[in-house]
Design a protein with these regions (language model features):
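Non-catalytic C-terminal interaction segments of nucleic acid-processing enzymes
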Residues: 5, 50, 102-173
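Short linear motifs centered on Gly/Pro in flexible linkers and helix caps
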Residues: 38, 69-70, 141, 158
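Accessory terminal regions of nucleic-acid processing enzymes
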Residues: 13-14, 33-35, 168-173
């Protein structure tokens, strides 16, 4: 990915993380660049009214395809291998994944149970890649990558109805 585009995505992600933190957290400590990049967390702090400290890795709305006009709110993109072939964010060190939503502001899902659930699904399918063309509807739990763009990442689309069966919190702000 070209550096200017990365910086733009990074800035947009940081603004979203600040939005989440300002509305929902107290005693915020921001991750260093290395912690964000390699440990996969944006900030640590406690949810308002809770004294326990957690690490959070904030995720924004996603389009199924970059060329799509609108963001979608049907499935969550879950990265288990990053663009350099290292561990993806679902294998990182955050405790909670706050995911921006359309139907309500945020869903927080515990990272480790999400990975355990996803890993079981991947093993059941023997890590089967999607056979669909980029413009066809996304296939839940099929493995996608962006090798065409020179990336070594692996990710799946997980329906929110399945995410909501895991331990989660819906936030109104």
């Amino acid at each position: 990915m070209e550096k200017g585009k990365y910086n733009s995505f990074h800035k947009e992600g940081h603004e979203l993380a600040k939005e989440f933190a300002n509305a929902n957290l107290e005693n915020v400590v921001w991750a260093t660049t290395d912690q964000d990049k390699f440990e996969h967390w944006d900030m640590e702090g406690n949810l308002v009214g809770d004294t326990r400290t957690f690490k959070f890795d904030v995720k924004g709305l996603k389009k199924f395809n970059r060329r799509d006009r609108d963001y979608q709110d049907e499935m969550m993109l879950v990265e288990y291998q990053n663009i350099t072939g290292g561990p993806g964010w679902v294998k990182g060190q955050s405790d909670w994944i706050p995911q921006k939503r359309i139907i309500y502001p945020w869903i927080l899902v515990k990272r480790e149970p999400l990975w355990n659930y996803l890993e079981d699904k991947l093993k059941e399918s023997n890590y089967a890649p999607s056979t669909r063309k980029w413009f066809e509807p996304k296939e839940p739990y099929a493995v996608y990558d962006r090798k065409f763009f020179g990336n070594d990442d692996r990710f799946v689309w997980v329906p929110y109805e399945d995410i909501e069966k895991l331990e989660h919190i819906k936030l109104a702000t």
